[in-house]
């Protein structure tokens, strides 16, 4: 990627990051690829902390906080397909909106948004489980609730499913259907709550409380989506634990990358 004025950008970014002063315009625009998208960040940004690169996000950890830069990359089924101009800014804005709107339902890791394409968050120990909530009998992957139902299975992640449901039909109630976070190159597995407890990944009491809170988050998301002519079909929540032991929502919430939406 061709970097333009990356060193000047780094200095301004670092000052804004250290002083925690919001930045009025995107400093990352100086790192755009010729096509107008942010596919990577300058090497100079490594001064912001230990670096980890995800499929879409660049992470810099320093002490008890993390700087997350949301790139314009788009991925599906663990493959980066390309970039979409300003996708990162849209994802970041949506995540911020939902974090702030739902903090009373489940605390989250957000500290501030120093740039349209980045956020400062509290460093957490991730819980190795994806908390997937589903409201409809749908999906395209082999591990989806619809594929299981199509194969004749009438129980999914410990939830009994009635006979006679059709594809894309609304489920009798919203369901928490956890999945494992498989190593890179492997598929996640949909599992039951009992399995998570048996594996020692989380206690039964914690899981019951988190199920209640995740379902509340999803219901709030569905209500707000309905007001705008949309259906929140299903979504994925990721959770982490602070050094204090408190469990908080991390990563993102109700974005198009983590959720399925339909037009109502």
For each predicted feature, which ranges?
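ATP-dependent phospho-/nucleotidyl transfer catalytic cores
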Residues: 120-122, 138-231, 242, 259-264
């Amino acid at each position: 990627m061709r970097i333009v004025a990356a060193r000047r950008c780094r200095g301004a970014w670092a000052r804004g990051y250290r002083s925690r002063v919001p930045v009025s315009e995107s400093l990352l625009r100086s790192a755009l690829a010729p096509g107008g998208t942010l596919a990577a960040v300058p090497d100079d940004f490594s001064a912001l902390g230990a670096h980890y690169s995800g499929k879409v996000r660049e992470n810099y950890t320093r002490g008890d906080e993390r700087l997350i830069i949301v790139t314009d990359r788009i991925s599906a089924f663990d493959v980066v397909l390309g970039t979409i101009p300003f996708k990162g800014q849209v994802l970041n804005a949506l995540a911020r909106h939902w974090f702030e709107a739902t903090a009373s339902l489940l605390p989250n890791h957000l500290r501030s948004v120093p740039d349209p394409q980045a956020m400062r968050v509290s460093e957490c120990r991730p819980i190795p489980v994806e908390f997937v909530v589903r409201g409809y009998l749908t999906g395209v992957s082999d591990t989806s609730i619809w594929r299981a139902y199509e194969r004749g299975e009438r129980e999914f992640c410990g939830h009994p499913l009635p006979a006679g449901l059709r594809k894309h039909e609304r489920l009798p109630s919203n369901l928490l259907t956890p999945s494992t976070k498989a190593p890179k190159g492997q598929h996640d597995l949909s599992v039951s709550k009992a399995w998570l407890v048996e594996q020692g990944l989380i206690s039964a009491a914690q899981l019951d409380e988190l199920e209640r809170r995740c379902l509340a988050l999803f219901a709030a998301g569905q209500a707000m989506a309905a007001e705008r002519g949309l259906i929140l079909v299903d979504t994925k929540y990721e959770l982490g634990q602070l050094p204090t032991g408190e469990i908080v929502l991390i990563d993102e919430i109700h974005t198009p990358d983590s959720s399925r939406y339909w037009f109502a």
